[in-house]
């Protein structure tokens, strides 16, 4: 059913039908495939696809739906390969939507929970970039500047190559 909902542009309905499978059948043999489908639905929304209400009425793209679905992926399968990339995508969407708190949270979880992930170096750079975006000038609070410098230094120390 989720595939049909996705093709019709009913992305949240697709996610909810996939969530039903996850909740009712946690030992489902194709559990990773379900998580992959949830990830695909979120990435379609992140790509800017037009959602349709009731399958025929075009509506506005709501990127917070993508964040919600990515959070569901992390919650449902925290040890899967999808979790680190979902957290990175949450931070990218949050930064685009000018929501640095959500970006900080996602990047912090990525850095702390998945330090061996291939996305950990990018998470350090992204965290520094988000802090750098908060710098408003020399007359204002210097904490974002210091934090950006700290994350750039951490990146250089932890990932010298």
Predicted regions and their residues:
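Acidic, polar-rich low-complexity tracts and alpha-helical solenoid repeat scaffolds
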Residues: 1-161
